[in-house]
């Protein structure tokens, strides 16, 4: 959204989504912003399996790989939205290099740390979601020779909670966005 409404800017100091509105005990609303802050809050306050490992070192490494995802998302987003071939190629190369780095860290799967879905998986799922929308041959080139990253991407795409995280018209809306940006990938 290029022209954000005033009500949104009032709620979101960073001007970004997502936002989470929470009713406090006294009836007053509190707004949380920033994806990871919201994820941490939900992990700490909602029932279910914890999304982080119990071991402090493993948990710290999970958080480090979550931090790594921010740069990956930035490179991917610039690649997806590029209207110039040189920028698209540069960002695709950077993203591919980051995937190669992750490849060596991945377990035998299906998720980042093995059989258990974790916060790392929840953070990377939106990154990998775009690859089900863009041209399949482009996805194949980016993931070529990276069997663990490819399997991880597939496992996340098949997970019901990941599918349910976006509206049924997500692909249509994203393609519309690419056309608005005159992105190379929209052609």
Predicted regions: what they are:
Residues 159:
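C-terminal active-site-capping segments
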Residues 33, 91, 129-130, 143-144, ...:
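Catalytic cores of transferase enzymes with a strong primary signal for eukaryotic protein kinases
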Residues 166-187:
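Acidic/histidine-enriched, glycine/proline-rich intrinsically disordered or flexible terminal extensions
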Residues 49, 132-138, 163-165:
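Substrate-binding/catalytic groove segments of enzymes
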Residues 114-137, 142-151, 156:
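GST superfamily/GST-like fold recognition
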Residues 1-110, 183-185:
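GST-like domain detector, emphasizing the conserved glutathione-binding G-site
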């Amino acid at each position: 959204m290029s022209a954000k409404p005033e009500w949104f800017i009032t709620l979101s100091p960073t001007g970004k989504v997502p936002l989470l509105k929470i009713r406090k005990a006294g009836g007053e609303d509190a707004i949380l912003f920033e994806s990871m802050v919201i994820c941490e809050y939900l992990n700490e306050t909602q029932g279910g399996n914890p999304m982080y490992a119990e071991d402090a070192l493993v948990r710290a490494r999970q958080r480090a790989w979550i931090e790594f995802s921010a740069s990956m998302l930035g490179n991917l987003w610039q690649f997806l939205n590029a209207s110039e071939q040189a920028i698209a190629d540069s960002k695709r190369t950077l993203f591919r290099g980051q995937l190669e780095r992750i490849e060596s860290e991945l377990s035998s799967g299906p998720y980042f740390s093995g059989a258990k879905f974790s916060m790392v998986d929840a953070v990377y799922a939106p990154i990998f979601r775009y690859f089900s929308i863009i041209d399949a041959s482009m996805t194949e080139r980016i993931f070529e020779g990276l069997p663990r990253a490819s399997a991880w991407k597939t496992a996340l795409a098949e997970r019901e909670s990941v599918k349910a995280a976006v509206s049924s018209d997500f692909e249509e809306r994203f393609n519309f966005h690419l056309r608005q940006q005159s992105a190379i990938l929209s052609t």
